[in-house]
Amino acid sequence: MTTDDSTNSESRDPSAAHRAALPKLEKNMKRIQDLTQRLMGAMSNKRKVPQDLQGPAPELYSKAGTVAFQEMIQNPSKIIEQQIGYWGKTLQHFVDAQQAFGKGELAAPVDDTPTDRRFANPLWQSHPYFNFLKQQYMLNAQAMDKAVTEMEGLDDSEKRRLEFFSHQIVDMLSPTNFLATNPDALTKAVETEGDSLVRGLENMIADLEANDGELVVSLADKSAFTVGENLATTPGEVVFRNHMFELIQYAPSTEKVHTTPLIIFPPWINKFYILDLKAQNSLIKWIVDQGFTLFVVSWANADASSRDIGMTDYVEDGYLTAFETVREICAVKKVNAVGYCIAGTTLSLSLTVMKERGIDYVNSATLFTTLTDFSDRGEVGVFLNDDFVDGIEAEVKEAGFLDSYFMSKTFSYLRSNDLIYQPAIRSYMLGEAPPAFDLLYWNGDGTNLPGKMAIEYLRGLCQNDKFATTGFDVAGISAKIADVEVPICAIACESDHIAAWKSSYQGVQKMGSKDKTFILSGSGHIAGIVNPPTKKKYGYCTNDDLSVSPDGWQAGARQHEGSWWPMWGDWLAKKSGKKIDARTPGSASYPPLAPAPGSYVLRAKVV
């Protein structure tokens, strides 16, 4: 009875409910004061990021401004037409909103703006305030896009960069990225009486403290995963270790295996266990289950002592040493090899070095999302001009290595809405904990690059395209793409924003091999490769005619459902000889040193 009276009293006196909420509000305010002190401390320890690595050189914008001014003088009608079109749409929307409001309707006017998942909350469509903000933002974005796209007087590279970085500015200014104009965040704050904002501030400060004062949003719950426990769990042994890498040999899961072993070289920009996340999507486990003796390289993480490690070291002490070790362990003359991304590029360089030296270690090579022709560098090319590369060169000259922070930041901005803004909204505005997502956990587990190697790769390959043109100097030779003569199977991904598939295709075309297979998988740089048959996702296409242009190849390609793994497995089996009794990891000369996944994947360096 007392409870009912109290409830009725509060309903009759709204101020009673407000008074009841005051202790919680006061607690949150006190918590915010404490968090503010932590915030100031984190910001005061902010790392110094070179100006050259924070954005394109000012010359890009000044040239664009000059071009726009010249166009305005020389062709004023075009500018006037653009502005009148923009003004007309903006004013018409304002008039429609005013008319709806004048009729006493709390409803939004007609909304013909395109669908955008950032604006999924129904209030963006129905509420006049939020809909007005959304429509005005979309009109501004369209006007900016049109102005940049139709700008004349810039070369193709400059125009691509201007389009990319103008999109970054437009995306950053979306009303969804600000608390006062985000209905999801405002609703959550009211429903939780401010708790969501306090949790969001806690999340933000934790990210700042973990990243030397840089705001790098956590994409995954780091406490949910442990490498070697619930990631990278396929059984195996480390059978070799040097200053460059650990070599893992995986335990067989079949009684018989193919004679010719397989070795995978993952990119050293990230850690190898992207191929062994969980049993359900592990390419490593799948390969072992198909009856192959599998070795995988786990690269050492660079630090200041890696300053002078270059591409030649990767070829000599990495690839050639790994080939020799696997040949001896398995008592075979040849191996099959896989290179993923930059590791595929370096595998191709190693093949040319071996040809020059008369070494015949490799029976076939598979290239995952690999660039060997850098004439078109795709979306990532906006970060490969001298302004950025000069900044990287200065950074590695001082530090001796390229911190993983810079590579991670670069790749994140290629998908900023998915990898920066939406995660930040969930974490900082809604106060949600990062998801327990294995792929995103791996994405945040970056590695550093040796200083010398980073510059050789960026200057000689990415910028100057020497491997596909004049020759790239490595290991005492001038490596040329035409000297890659072993059988090749290349897998590229249609929406890859790091290794554009058309460039990958063009590189395969230039190789000297008479036995070439090209597979185009759906999706992107990671999901297109980590695409197990059980998921039945994405699909892939093939075309035996590699003499045509990329567009011609795609137009004539045959579409297949599901994963490309089984097709590649059949191709690889034909290159792998007869079946023999399964091999256990190691040999008399190379006894097991430690269980997989080894120690290099768990820390920066083994001393």
Named regions from a protein language model:
Residues 1-246, 257-258, 295, 507, ...:
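Amphipathic, low-complexity, repeat-rich surface-exposed segments
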Residues 152-188, 328, 332, 346, ...:
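Alpha/beta-hydrolase-fold enzymes
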Residues 257-268:
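Short beta-strand element of the alpha/beta-hydrolase
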Residues 276-294:
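Short amphipathic alpha-helix adjacent to the substrate-entry channel of hydrolases
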Residues 306-330, 346:
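Alpha/beta-hydrolase active-site loop
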Residues 339-344:
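Gly/Ala-rich beta-loop-alpha elbow adjacent to hydrolase catalytic centers
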Residues 490-492, 496:
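Short beta-strand/loop motif that positions the catalytic acidic residue
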Residues 500-510:
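Short alpha-helix in the alpha/beta-hydrolase fold that links the catalytic acid
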